[in-house]
Every structure is written in C-alpha cells, then in structure tokens.
Amino acid sequence: MKTFSIKSSNIKRHWYYVDATNKILGRLASALSFHLRGKHKTEYTPHLDTGDYIIVINASKILVTGNKRINKIYYHHTGYVGGIKQSRFEEMISSHPERVIEIAVKGMLPKGALGRSMFKKLKVFSNENHEHIAQCPQLLNI
C-alpha cells in the first residue's frame, strides 16, 4: 500500500468567512492559521498549500485578555537608521484593525514562500462589508 500524496492541480479550495466579534485574538489566529494551512483536510500535505480562503469580518471588534489592550506593543522599522516605530494595541485597533489579525496569523504560518502563499488567502475587513460576495463564502464556526 502506498502513501497518498495529492497533486497541486487536484486541490479543492473553499471560501469561508469568520465573524471576529468578541473573539479572543490568539485563539482566533490559531484557528485561522490551522485552516489556512489545510490541516483540517484529510489530504493535507506539508509541502503543498492545501488550505482554504478565509474572510474575516468585524476585525475592529476583536478582544484581547488581561492588560494587553494597554500594554501590547507592535514594532516596525522604516528602514532608516534609528527608524524603529512602535504603536500600542489600542492605537493599532483604532487606526488599522485588520493589521492586528494579519500580524497574529502571519506569525503562526510557516516562514518562506509556502507561508506567503498561505497568507495571501487571508482577507481581513474591519467591518461587515467585504468584496468577496461572489465567491459565496460559508460561515466557519470558530
């Protein structure tokens, strides 16, 4: 008996949407990365991108536990000398709420080309309106 290995041409991808209202950031990001990698499928293969497309709505209503709302700091660098910038979770959620989920999920995906292709299947929106209605996404309960 041989081990079954799926070909990239035979991968079937579905569209799902998740409502992030009152969800904990880390738990949601963990579940999203699990589905983006395709580990919920029986034909999961570590070296292929077998995951599904996921749309996250209401990213501005995500929750964090403890004092992270005040104390969590996001860093980025401009590329110039001394150009390290920081912003707190409260500032980030008010100005760019979709980036909070994107940063959390990106850290849980594999590093490299495969992880980048998985990350491209994540679509995050700060409110209920999204532009992927034509794909007929199904609700994913997380």
Swiss-Prot record:
GO process terms (BP): negative regulation of translation; translation
Molecular function per GO: mRNA binding; structural constituent of ribosome
GO CC list: cytosolic large ribosomal subunit
Keywords for the protein's UniProt record, in alphabetical order: Ribonucleoprotein, Ribosomal protein
Coiled-coil intervals, chain numbering: none
Gene3D superfamilies listed in its UniProt record: Ribosomal protein L13 (3.90.1180.10)
Pfam families documented for this protein: Ribosomal_L13
Family annotation (InterPro entries): Ribosomal_uL13, Ribosomal_uL13_bac-type, Ribosomal_uL13_CS, Ribosomal_uL13_sf
Disulfide pattern: none
Domain of life: Bacteria
Its job: This protein is one of the early assembly proteins of the 50S ribosomal subunit, although it is not seen to bind rRNA by itself. It is important during the early stages of 50S assembly.
Listed NCBIfam families: rplM_bact
Family statement drawn from the similarity comment of this UniProt entry: Belongs to the universal ribosomal protein uL13 family.
PANTHER family: LARGE RIBOSOMAL SUBUNIT PROTEIN UL13M, RIBOSOMAL PROTEIN L13
Subunit structure of this chain's protein: Part of the 50S ribosomal subunit.
Name of the featured protein: Large ribosomal subunit protein uL13
Organism: Buchnera aphidicola subsp. Acyrthosiphon pisum (strain APS)
Lineage of the species this protein comes from: Bacteria, Pseudomonadati, Pseudomonadota, Gammaproteobacteria, Enterobacterales
Gene: rplM
